[in-house]
Amino acid sequence: MGPGLWVVMGVLVGVAGGHDTYWTEQIDPWFLHGLGLARTYWRDTNTGRLWLPNTPDASDPQRGRLAPPGELNLTTASVPMLRWYAERFCFVLVTTAEFPRDPGQLLYIPKTYLLGRPRNASLPELPEAGPTSRPPAEVTQLKGLSHNPGASALLRSRAWVTFAAAPDREGLTFPRGDDGATERHPDGRRNAPPPGPPAGTPRHPTTNLSIAHLHNASVTWLAARGLLRTPGRYVYLSPSASTWPVGVWTTGGLAFGCDAALVRARYGKGFMGLVISMRDSPPAEIIVVPADKTLARVGNPTDENAPAVLPGPPAGPRYRVFVLGAPTPADNGSALDALRRVAGYPEESTNYAQYMSRAYAEFLGEDPGSGTDARPSLFWRLAGLLASSGFAFVNAAHAHDAIRLSDLLGFLAHSRVLAGLAARGAAGCAADSVFLNVSVLDPAARLRLEARLGHLVAAILEREQSLVAHALGYQLAFVLDSPAAYGAVAPSAARLIDALYAEFLGGRALTAPMVRRALFYATAVLRAPFLAGAPSAEQRERARRGLLITTALCTSDVAAATHADLRAALARTDHQKNLFWLPDHFSPCAASLRFDLAEGGFILDALAMATRSDIPADVMAQQTRGVASVLTRWAHYNALIRAFVPEATHQCSGPSHNAEPRILVPITHNASYVVTHTPLPRGIGYKLTGVDVRRPLFITYLTATCEGHAREIEPKRLVRTENRRDLGLVGAVFLRYTPAGEVMSVLLVDTDATQQQLAQGPVAGTPNVFSSDVPSVALLLFPNGTVIHLLAFDTLPIATIAPGFLAASALGVVMITAALAGILRVVRTCVPFLWRRE
């Protein structure tokens, strides 16, 4: 090409396989000669309009073949968007020395024209590239046409056109975290390295997994090669357009989000790109590269200096972290602090479990906030911990070339739990909009794994009856997250919840970690159908009963004990040897329809049960309120209520009400009781007597109708007999409340044994969940909408008859019978005689 022409060719690189070649950075000295000309490349300095190239007319018989393809729809409006790439074409920009007065020509050449063409004999022969001993770079920034005087104005970053992704460079250049890696501790000061496979340990193919492998998942190792994604070439594009594309060897990614937030993490060899965006806060981006790499910021085309490096903390022994975001100390100090902490996470551990344990603790340790509102700082921290967990999991699996089965199932299960908690509890998302996509497994291998696990789900529930086996089956269904898996385990999960309720009524405390874990996954299985759309009638009925049982399991004593258990568990957790797994501390309150656990009465009850501690009282009270708020946010599913308790959200014409439900009791398949602090305009309403006037309580029986009227609660003394006959209470709900307006228990009378337990009252030495030493009022809520104030059960004695009296009575009956027989005989004899005489 002659000296009078300048040619700029851009080749966009996508995902490709193979490890034989990679990107290498080459500097054209011509670029440097023209740096001073960049400031002159504005076509119209008055309006700041970007320079636009000319394109051939597709109808031109000579040059139409070089016109932009029709699918790009390039116009003067779309050309500045830089969407020039078409998969079937290469584009070439030809300009002259008169640039920018001559805007140049943007030409498109089909790739098919370039394939298989013979070499031009007039061109000098290129030397063959010999083999190189240098391994391919893990991370290479593709600066492309940076500071090219012929293209920098055209390819000017949108970050300099519309916004700057790092407005406060000094604010985003902060010191390294306290737990970050050092030369002495290159994997983090508090790192607990994940175990590797012992020498000689076999690697099991996923197609051969059995129930025995599931029971011994902690010593069952799978081959990473073939199960994980094979590293492939990939170009990471920063959404902020503040840095140039980065070439990496991708190993997968993790994404989760909802209607109010989105998190995307891209993993690679020595690389992680994390983007966090929310509806209620500006976006943030974290980029992790090897310690010896730098990422240049896309500079102003008129700047003659070399581009600046992206902000972030100083490099560590293994990685360097760059930060892009808008928060500044002046306007959002908490968000900036959260971003600083997120930037330190990738260097603090190589063990995925440590990150997940810390994420659970972050969720429970956050200040209560206000209801279900979004809290960006908490969401950023949870997203950073979850993304760093995936980064550590993938890196450890590739380093060991093996994956422990328990780690694989644990990572997938806890990722789903944490994504849901972060989305609903921190981002304010609608529950039915939450999604999670973990793409670190090879797609074909994942299908084989899911098929095998789906087979084992049905087998383990069919062949084994232990609680451990059933909890494992429910966890597998939760990991698979498919309608088929949920349908296979849902009947078993419903029976398990009923069985645990029977044990609870018998006085057993459901506090063992295995019981809590089984209850966690069982309730998750029953709630799952509402995420897939409208549940069937069977699914709705099963879920309604499950919600009713978990609400019954959540008494005031259970709620207070849950606070104490969570505080104690968090206090002894160091996230190294002692990890915190939330399913092992699960409370039925978190899956119930009780939304009153953050009220003052429950907080005082929880503090009363607190053991002696050096923690200041105000700090303990704040922690308790935080845990109570978490339980409420965890359980508060507006979408779930609409799906399974639609009568509670039924819309009627006329004035609406803002009464927030405190407790929901789905007592039949189409009717529910709701407890509120203000009366509702529809349904059968009852005002509870003897309650503090500052916190009144109302109970309303709701159906799908819009009529409403009030009734009085009638006090009654019920009668029980000593022959244990049916009392007509099966299906009713026993509700106990205090004068302070605290509902202590909402217990379902589900069987004859339960109604007999209620009627008989407390027995010495045997716990009875229906009784209470606290001054309170007991109500019975019946399925037909009737509510009575239960005063007591009166015993109706059975009359005692002496044996002698029975013998005399029998003799009297015999004598009377004989007399009647004699009289009848006389009548039969006399009547014919008198008839003949007449």
Curated annotation (Swiss-Prot):
The keyword Transcription regulation does not apply. Residues 1-18 form the signal peptide. The chain crosses the membrane at residues 804-824. GO terms for cellular component: host cell endosome membrane; host cell plasma membrane; membrane; viral envelope; virion membrane. Residues 825-838 are intravirion. Disulfide bonds join 258-429. Residues 171-190 have a biased composition (Basic and acidic residues). Glycans are attached at residues 73, 120, 208, 216, 332, 437, 670, 784. Gene3D superfamilies: 1.20.58.1340, 3.10.360.40, 3.30.500.50, Herpesvirus glycoprotein H, C-terminal domain. It holds the Pfam family Herpes_glycoH_C. Residues 21-803 are virion surface. Residues 171-207 are annotated as: Disordered. It comes from the Viruses. The keyword Transmembrane helix applies. GO terms for biological process: fusion of virus membrane with host plasma membrane; symbiont entry into host cell. It is a single-pass type I membrane protein. Residues 259-323 are annotated as: Interaction with gL. Keywords: Disulfide bond, Fusion of virus membrane with host cell membrane, Fusion of virus membrane with host membrane, Glycoprotein, Host cell membrane, Host endosome, Host membrane, Host-virus interaction, Membrane, Sialic acid, Signal, Transmembrane, Transmembrane helix, Viral envelope protein, Viral penetration into host cytoplasm, Virion, Virus entry into host cell. N-glycosylated, O-glycosylated, and sialylated. Belongs to the herpesviridae glycoprotein H family. The heterodimer glycoprotein H-glycoprotein L is required for the fusion of viral and plasma membranes leading to virus entry into the host cell. Following initial binding to host receptor, membrane fusion is mediated by the fusion machinery composed of gB and the heterodimer gH/gL. May also be involved in the fusion between the virion envelope and the outer nuclear membrane during virion morphogenesis. Interaction with host integrins ITGAV/ITGB3 triggers release of cytosolic Ca(2+) and FAK phosphorylation leading to efficient viral entry into host genital tract epithelial cells. Interacts with glycoprotein L (gL); this interaction is necessary for the correct processing and cell surface expression of gH. The heterodimer gH/gL seems to interact with gB trimers during fusion. Interacts with host integrins ITGAV/ITGB3 to mediate viral entry into epithelial cells. HAMAP family: HSV_GH (MF_04033). This is Envelope glycoprotein H. The lineage of its organism: Viruses, Duplodnaviria, Heunggongvirae, Peploviricota, Herviviricetes. The gene is gH.
